[in-house]
């Protein structure tokens, strides 16, 4: 199972990504959670301490490793565009509650289409992840599909957009669905978070096709409190855990 979770900052995609990862780990599955958001906080949501999270060097910052794998150096402008990185996900991952956390980071291309060694290695690792046939891979991504090439995207089982009740949030779903269609992906699912009442549900249902909906997560002060304290929502909110468990069942049913 390969799942990409995206959405604007603050909508709760990391809550969903971290809880799904731990639920799959509870089943004894090999789970690799990749944090591909520049505001990397998936580690905290999985249960790492702030000190542990701060000690992790994102893959995108491992410039020497990128040079070694691509063969790049100061004297040579040529390097491998498809380096062997098959050993890196397991070697670089941090284990937490049965989940292997891989903090990817991002490479700022400035809109130039950069193919620098850092970017090449990052792309190669992400491609490698989706070909790990028997593993569960969950990617926590910023609002877009820029990190996924057409080939990588075609291997994903689920694209999930996390939204809130609001026109701007719904527009994010519309934009990502258009981007997905451009690279050949026709199925984009939605999880609506921070739902307070039935009117919120009706707002979402009136704007999102029923076949795209995976489920709802209620507004939860305990989840917000867990975030403030740097704790895992999995450990703090039984209600949210039950709702995400139901969303997981819907994901598995669509596999």
Regions found by a protein language model. Give the residues of each.
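Conserved lysine of the Walker
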Residues: 13
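N-terminal phosphate/diphosphate-binding loop that engages ATP/GTP or pyrophosphate donors
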Residues: 23-97
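Inter-motif core of Ras-like GTPase G domains
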Residues: 124-133, 148-167
């Amino acid at each position: 199972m390969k799942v990409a979770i995206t959405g604007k900052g603050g909508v709760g995609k990391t809550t969903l990504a971290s809880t799904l990862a731990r639920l799959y780990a509870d089943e004894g599955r090999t789970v690799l959670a990749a944090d591909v958001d520049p505001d990397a906080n998936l580690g905290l949501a999985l249960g790492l301490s702030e000190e542990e999270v701060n000690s992790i060097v994102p893959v995108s910052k491992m410039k020497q490793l990128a040079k070694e794998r691509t063969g790049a150096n100061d004297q040579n402008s040529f390097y491998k565009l498809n380096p062997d990185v098959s050993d890196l996900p397991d070697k670089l991952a941090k284990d937490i509650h049965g989940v292997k956390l891989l903090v990817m980071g991002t490479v700022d291309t400035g809109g130039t289409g950069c193919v620098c060694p850092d970017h090449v290695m990052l792309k190669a690792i992400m491609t490698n992840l989706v070909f790990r046939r028997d593993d569960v891979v969950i990617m926590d991504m910023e609002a877009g599909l820029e990190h996924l090439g057409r080939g990588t995207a075609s291997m994903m089982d689920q694209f999930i957009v996390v939204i809130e009740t609001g026109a701007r949030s719904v527009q994010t779903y519309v934009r990502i669905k258009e981007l997905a269609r451009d690279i050949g992906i026709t199925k984009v699912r939605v999880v609506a978070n921070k739902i307070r009442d039935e009117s919120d549900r009706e707002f979402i249902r009136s704007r999102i096709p029923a076949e795209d909906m995976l489920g709802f997560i209620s507004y939860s002060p305990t989840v917000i409190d867990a975030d403030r304290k740097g704790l895992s929502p999995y450990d703090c909110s039984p209600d949210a855990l039950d709702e995400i468990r139901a969303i997981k069942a819907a994901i598995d049913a669509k596999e």
